[in-house]
Amino acid sequence: MFDILWNVGWSNGPPSWAEMERVLNGKPRHAGVPAFDADGDVPRSRKRGAYQPPGRERVGSSVAYAELHAHSAYSFLDGASTPEELVEEAARLGLCALALTDHDGLYGAVRFAEAAAELDVRTVFGAELSLGATARTERPDPPGPHLLVLARGPEGYRRLSRQLAAAHLAGGEKGKPRYDFDALTEAAGGHWHILTGCRKGHVRQALSQGGPAAAQRALADLVDRFTPSRVSIELTHHGHPLDDERNAALAGLAPRFGVGIVATTGAHFADPSRGRLAMAMAAIRARRSLDSAAGWLAPLGGAHLRSGEEMARLFAWCPEAVTAAAELGERCAFGLQLIAPRLPPFDVPDGHTEDSWLRSLVMAGARERYGPPKSAPRAYSQIEHELKVIAQLRFPGYFLVVHDITRFCRDNDILCQGRGSAANSAVCYALGVTAVDPVANELLFERFLSPARDGPPDIDIDIESDQREKVIQYVYHKYGRDYAAQVANVITYRGRSAVRDMARALGFSPGQQDAWSKQVSHWTGQADDVDGIPEQVIDLATQIRNLPRHLGIHSGGMVICDRPIADVCPVEWARMANRSVLQWDKDDCAAIGLVKFDLLGLGMLSALHYAKDLVAEHKGIEVDLARLDLSEPAVYEMLARADSVGVFQVESRAQMATLPRLKPRVFYDLVVEVALIRPGPIQGGSVHPYIRRRNGVDPVIYEHPSMAPALRKTLGVPLFQEQLMQLAVDCAGFSAAEADQLRRAMGSKRSTERMRRLRGRFYDGMRALHGAPDEVIDRIYEKLEAFANFGFPESHALSFASLVFYSAWFKLHHPAAFCAALLRAQPMGFYSPQSLVADARRHGVAVHGPCVNASLAHATCENAGTEVRLGLGAVRYLGAELAEKLVAERTANGPFTSLPDLTSRVQLSVPQVEALATAGALGCFGMSRREALWAAGAAATGRPDRLPGVGSSSHIPALPGMSELELAAADVWATGVSPDSYPTQFLRADLDAMGVLPAERLGSVSDGDRVLIAGAVTHRQRPATAQGVTFINLEDETGMVNVLCTPGVWARHRKLAHTAPALLIRGQVQNASGAITVVAERMGRLTLAVGARSRDFR
């Protein structure tokens, strides 16, 4: 049963607690030292940083040339270089302009424009339109011509963007634009320039298929539609044997129609090194291997950018084509400096402006939140200040839109709350957008909005995930699909997908593709063990990594405009029904100035809503979250025991390890707990100093007395971004707006010039205000600079801390409802349904399997809200929709009396009936699971619409019952959950004989003792802040164990530790601080008869 691999000697003791602190938390860095090692496994900003030029030497060019036909990786598998790489190569080669002409979209336009602005390359915007009726990925060489359009200035861009959007929406589904050639003709209006294109262009295709006469007719049609002055014949040379002959024939057509000739490279990558990758990507697009697709794929070896000199040599017989390309590029070039649309005017009552209506709503809300003005002068003074800034920046409409969205949620009983820096605003609090009082919590409004900041404010609205679609559709309905769209999320190649697709392109079998991809680590994207993976697969996978694969939907970003969005960016259908999405991601939208709203789905809000409903339904208790006593000691005592499975934000192994050391006693302790276990505070070295001060081990000290007001709440340890701003105010006399400038200058997008100016301002202010010597100011400024990248927003932590308390309160007082609510809100949270159910059982909650006569479609409560019943939707093959139908039939026509009665009233397939039988859901008919399985086929095939006698026999022979182990295995197979057992309990006798300690007994083990533990692996984590340390969470029937694996131990047991569903581990206990961790030394395989799956996170 046990395959124990003892590979580590006892002499290799575990690291000391001090060493663990260093690994887990890093050290504070000195000013000017980079926050991250660029090559390490380190945290990354979610925002795309400003484009940084590579500083490559430029070769220049004596021949003027502009590339007018280039595809980037945003042609999705038809380009092997990013827009930035194309611009960099164009700059190196000295091109006078570069056109980006991706397929059917402007996906890379913003990145292209940003890079070009930095490198002083003139930009031409265009697209290659696929006029065929099939998707580009459906076959190796889809039929239908292409039309290459170049926009002549901003108006041409707007017209092109509109037509791209119209075609995508007319196609009715993602990836199948449907163009109307006549509509394109009319839309051009002299603002486009048409190139005859590559081999798929009208003229080239006609020449290949019908000879010169056909080519002449195709060119005549283009000229008739777009006029001779707006059409040019395109010549390319990719090394094909017929290139010269075709180019000569095409050039011969020009004089007859009075059109120009331009030379292009038809580039699909920046330089020749990407040629092999481009072919591999084309094969993936064709859904074939390189070998099988070779007959269809166009030659791409020469499809890279070239200098003017090289183009002049290639087209020495037609030099005017190179000159004309440069001239046309100059005429078409413009910067992407579009005027960003504003929000649409908000519909306000008669007699009001947006400013006056916002003031009216805010003052009404303030009276509810704060009482009359005389009772809260500070609050009303702050509100007046904020309203003045909002009016000055012309943002009242933004706040009215957000208020309208939250009003819709409240009116439709949908839980929502604003979070992030919006919680710094008293206006947002008065409007009911946020639940945090910024005045009482002394939060700085300027962290959210100030006259010195660029762009609109950023308000994130968390919405219960199961109801978010209603809110999104409300926005579409209110503002119109032409004026509202979701922001895209560009799905890029990561390690596993890169290896799988490149192995496929090279013709390896699906099984081999899968096996090699699984060798790639979840955490680094690198192959942990490259043995057996061919070098060519690794080489191509490395090249394609981080290139775009396809377009997805951002988790919640929506853009609303006062004009059709397609005037700025094309819109297309998403895979999800009734969702239209921009072709740009959130960073693109921000760069252009589009106003974005984040409507984010939060599973815990759904779970809290379900818990409220279940408690009301089964216990008759109406819970008002806003009225819960946030000082209730029992809640904090439970959290201090790290009894937090399922509790929002504090259920991870890192949070569980911190809770017993922090010992939360008041609400603000939860705010700190939420903020502590984050990449910023961890990398900044704030975690353990705070805890030592919190527990009285270290004294609370300040570099200067002026720091005390800002840092008093966190015991002198900086945790929050707002504290950096407050320190600038208190120490150096900065205004709040100046303090926000300092925070931003020191942040992830550091500005050397701004930092130099503000540094001088800080020193001068502190000398003048406090007479502080320079050595003290040096130390304070150094700490600010080191901390700037790490601070967590206090407003964000405050918003989340409320949800921590609410969820912990339900876990403490209504554990059955809490468990059922979490199961109903899946997928969400840190733990699997199996672990949630096991934790509920450890808290005395009885959990029952699904039953066709007792279960709802989802998990619910029974026995006055003290027990949990699993839902029918959790049964394999059923799903929520069929489960709802089954429950509706039972509700309408009474309980099912037998299996034949069930299958006659609800249409079920044989696999579905068998899954119900396996889950024990048919036990209400007096049948054992084996008997129900035997009868499943006959019942499912013996419906009233079948002729009698053609189904299976309904006779059930005498069958033995299932053992407890078999029942547990059946439960897990059918629902993923064993309601009344845990897999390890069936091995307990053998484990006891081996000296394996149950999880619940680890608390009595002395610090430093070695133990043998075993359990199912629930999680594997390698945080970016842990410098290679991997954490494994083991669970047995008594509880959970946090296991720490040093890089050496992980390397020695890599395959076992990475893949085994259950492990036997010998290691050393560390529990001196009250948080129990086992530092692994040896690992062995534990074979479970009942299946278990882990959730592995980065």
From Swiss-Prot:
Keyword flag DNA repair: yes
EC number: 2.7.7.7
GO biological process: DNA repair; DNA replication; error-prone translesion synthesis; response to antibiotic
Presence of keyword tRNA-binding: no
SMART domains, per the entry: POLIIIAc
GO molecular function, one term: 3'-5' exonuclease activity
Domain of life from the UniProt record: Bacteria
Pfam family, one: PHP
InterPro entries listed in its UniProt record: DNA_pol3_alpha_NTPase_dom (IPR011708), DNA_pol3_finger (IPR040982), DnaE2 (IPR023073), DnaE2/DnaE/PolC (IPR004805), DNAPol_HHH (IPR029460), NA-bd_OB_tRNA (IPR004365), PHP_dom (IPR004013), Pol/His_phosphatase_N (IPR003141)
Induction: Up-regulated in response to all forms of DNA damage. LexA-regulated.
Root EC class: transferase
One GO CC term on file: peptidoglycan-based cell wall
Keywords: Cytoplasm, DNA damage, DNA repair, DNA replication, DNA-directed DNA polymerase, Nucleotidyltransferase, Transferase
Subcellular localization: Cytoplasm
Catalytic function, reaction form: DNA(n) + a 2'-deoxyribonucleoside 5'-triphosphate = DNA(n+1) + diphosphate
Annotated region (Disordered), positions in chain: 34-57
Family annotation (NCBIfam families): polc (TIGR00594), PRK05672.1 (NF004225)
Family as reported in the entry's similarity comment: Belongs to the DNA polymerase type-C family. DnaE2 subfamily.
Described purpose of this protein according to its UniProt entry: DNA polymerase involved in damage-induced mutagenesis and translesion synthesis (TLS). It is not the major replicative DNA polymerase. Does not appear to be essential for chromosomal replication. May be involved in generating antibiotic resistance.
Listed name of the protein: Error-prone DNA polymerase
Lineage: Bacteria, Bacillati, Actinomycetota, Actinomycetes, Mycobacteriales
